[in-house]
Amino acid sequence: MLRVVEGIFIFVVISEXVFGVLGNGFIGLVNCIDCAKNKLSTIGFILTGLAISRIFLIWIIITDGFIQIFSPDIYASGNLIEYISYFWVIGNQSSMWFATSLSIFYFLKIANFSNYIFLWLKSRTNMVLPFMIVFLLISSLLNFAHIAKILNDYKMKNDTVWDLNMYKSEYFIKQILLNLGVIFFFTLSLITCVFLIISLWRHNRQMQSNVTGLRDSNTEAHVKAMKVLISFXILFILYFIGMAIEISCFTVRENKLLLMFGMTTTAIYPWGHSFILILGNSKLKQASLRVLQQLKCCEKRKNLRVT
């Protein structure tokens, strides 16, 4: 029975990885075509970076998970766990700061506040976003340097060999330190999400006072952005839960089923949010519909040739 359940989990994880690569690859491809036509916008640049970083993150999640499931002893020899930790931090942090940039972009473009600083930033969104991306990148690099020091100190402490039988509390503390930068970016995204909710509530109250009874384009934009940001927050919480399960399984290696469940939960975030972005972005949605129409036409042609 366990073998069957394990097989189901492995199938689900592989399917998530395939969907994740296809979804994020589609986002990246559409925006790269726009870049070739010199039509790449700020949002297009952010989505391209987010797609590439998430493809990288998916491969790290799958590689790390399968090594822990099928060849856990490999971690005990050499520096593999150190290299995977570095790659995971790069993929995780780059994915988060692109996602945070996307949240800030939605906030500046859609939200309505009378605050002078907000209005100044809103009028210069296309100038502010590049500086914001650079700021997030620099903070990621500084955090990465701190992470490298943590990993190096821990490695030296254990005589250049990673001790898999470390105290659980010490291992969890190390993982919390590794995720400090990600938690900071996620907090920024949550703050922008809360401000968008406040802006939507105030806008709806103004619309009700006008007694129009119709949803204007501003309300639609608010709702669409809220769906993307709330789904991001929910999926990222699931991602964190999955990571916590995987970390706990790292210290207790007997429970493979729990590890597979954690890996399945973790992989939902990078592939699920990509499809939400496709459905929430009019350009990506239209491009996906055109692709589906082309696939249907190809299928009809094949059927006609067979008959």
From Swiss-Prot:
GO MF term set: bitter taste receptor activity; G protein-coupled receptor activity
Record-annotated disulphide pairs: none
Membrane topology: Multi-pass membrane protein
Keywords, sorted A to Z: G-protein coupled receptor, Glycoprotein, Membrane, Receptor, Sensory transduction, Taste, Transducer, Transmembrane, Transmembrane helix
Positions in the Extracellular compartment: 1-6, 64-100, 148-179, 249-257
GO terms under cellular component: membrane; plasma membrane
Gene3D superfamilies named in the record: Rhodopsin 7-helix transmembrane proteins (1.20.1070.10)
InterPro entries: TAS2R (IPR007960)
Chain segments annotated as transmembrane: 7-27, 43-63, 101-121, 127-147, 180-200, 228-248, 258-278
Sugar attachment sites: N92, N158
UniProt-listed Pfam families: TAS2R
Tagged with keyword Transmembrane helix: yes
Taxonomic superkingdom: Eukaryota
Cytoplasmic side: 28-42, 122-126, 201-227, 279-307
The keyword Transmembrane helix belongs to this UniProt entry's keyword annotation: yes
Subcellular localization, as worded in the UniProt entry: Membrane
More about this protein: Most taste cells may be activated by a limited number of bitter compounds; individual taste cells can discriminate among bitter stimuli.
Primary role: Receptor that may play a role in the perception of bitterness and is gustducin-linked. May play a role in sensing the chemical composition of the gastrointestinal content. The activity of this receptor may stimulate alpha gustducin, mediate PLC-beta-2 activation and lead to the gating of TRPM5.
PANTHER family: TASTE RECEPTOR TYPE 2, TASTE RECEPTOR TYPE 2 MEMBER 10
Family: Belongs to the G-protein coupled receptor T2R family.
Protein name, as recorded: Taste receptor type 2 member 10
Source organism of this protein record: Gorilla gorilla gorilla (Western lowland gorilla)
